[in-house]
């Protein structure tokens, strides 16, 4: 085929006319100083707060301090190769992380990059890590339960979908154990889980992931890990990244549970970043906005109404509410709940589960202090059967603790007091539960009914847990239809009660 010169010139002209050249104008600055992962940059005049900055060597940073003649930024990742005089580009984008079902079963870092060696994550969507919490009109009251499978939690401090329930206690009191048990118990409950590990040892996180895998919980769980060896900036951002991943499910009419383990270390990381950015320190050297640090994170956990979900999904999902339930963890120093960060988070959340060192060391695990642990909104969401049967448990325990303190000094006790002490000892023993062994609603109902009606009163304290285990196995074998009915309806009617009483009486005869 031969082309004449005029055709060639026409072809070239048409190619030139159709050439798509997208010219982008990006602001550039110069690195003035680099210290401990914090850079000062001169010349970025129109950068936004929280904007991503591009450093040489495919490294990114986050603009946090906007000053008159310079910008203070944290480097996300390695910063050893960055030197004074390097060019920094503004990207015009706020920090985003991948979201969606593709992340389920994976372990990622604070930027959503996989760190579990299972290959890349092909997520179709990304979302901003900093988002405004749903407004008052978009919310719906908490009315559906989150079953943790722990007798002491579900009976005394129930948690509802969309609630923020703080887990607080000293180190080594079983805070992570309560949170991990709650995740394991969500199997088959249509609940997606996000576990955010902040500032923990890599070996500890690996152990949690292994336990979740062994119990089949990684099938619905995302793990976001910012280990102790990572930069303070990554530890500070990881909680927001995890929250964004959880919000993906909430906004599409599904339910999600997020555990922040723990927010004390996140506050420490933020304090470190703030001091390096030369922000003025306040109480305990924290910056002035440390309350806002946690409030803007925890307010994003909410139950949103069907209108919000329908609007968000452009009518694809109708008649469904979505929820994000948060279980933040706070570590106290020598039981001091009046320190700065614990009081802040207590005031933000809808209740707290307080774990005590003394109870833990006495072998009462989970070591929940019934007196000062509360759930402000969970009562409305509690399963009907558990709510009906657990009314006396909290009172029994609280009165027992008070009487036990007096009984140490009193030599002669009247029968009523002695009976109350005996009941209290058995209830305390009954609230013990091994790790990774959550109970179903039916199993919990059997136990609570038996203790409320005095069936444990003549059982030796040392044999209470054996009696409970035997009773549950017996009822499940003798009355499987009752167990199935309680599981389905979450209620115990008069007929069910008769069947249960007969089964317990029969078991007590055979118990020796």
From Swiss-Prot:
CDD domains: ATP-synt_F1_alpha_C, ATP-synt_F1_alpha_N, F1-ATPase_alpha_CD
UniProt binding sites for ATP: 169-176
Chief place of localization: membrane
Keywords assigned by UniProt, alphabetized: ATP synthesis, ATP-binding, Cell inner membrane, Cell membrane, CF(1), Hydrogen ion transport, Ion transport, Membrane, Nucleotide-binding, Translocase, Transport
A single Gene Ontology CC term: proton-transporting ATP synthase complex
Membrane topology: Peripheral membrane protein
Compartment annotation: Cell inner membrane
GO molecular function: ADP binding; ATP binding; proton-transporting ATP synthase activity, rotational mechanism
Catalytic reaction(s) noted: ATP + H2O + 4 H(+)(in) = ADP + phosphate + 5 H(+)(out)
PROSITE patterns: ATPASE_ALPHA_BETA (PS00152)
Record flagged with keyword Methyltransferase: no
Function: Produces ATP from ADP in the presence of a proton gradient across the membrane. The alpha chain is a regulatory subunit.
Record note on quaternary structure: F-type ATPases have 2 components, CF(1) - the catalytic core - and CF(0) - the membrane proton channel. CF(1) has five subunits: alpha(3), beta(3), gamma(1), delta(1), epsilon(1). CF(0) has three main subunits: a(1), b(2) and c(9-12). The alpha and beta chains form an alternating ring which encloses part of the gamma chain. CF(1) is attached to CF(0) by a central stalk formed by the gamma and epsilon chains, while a peripheral stalk is formed by the delta and b chains.
Family indicated by similarity: Belongs to the ATPase alpha/beta chains family.
Protein's UniProt name: ATP synthase subunit alpha
Gene source species: Azoarcus sp. (strain BH72)
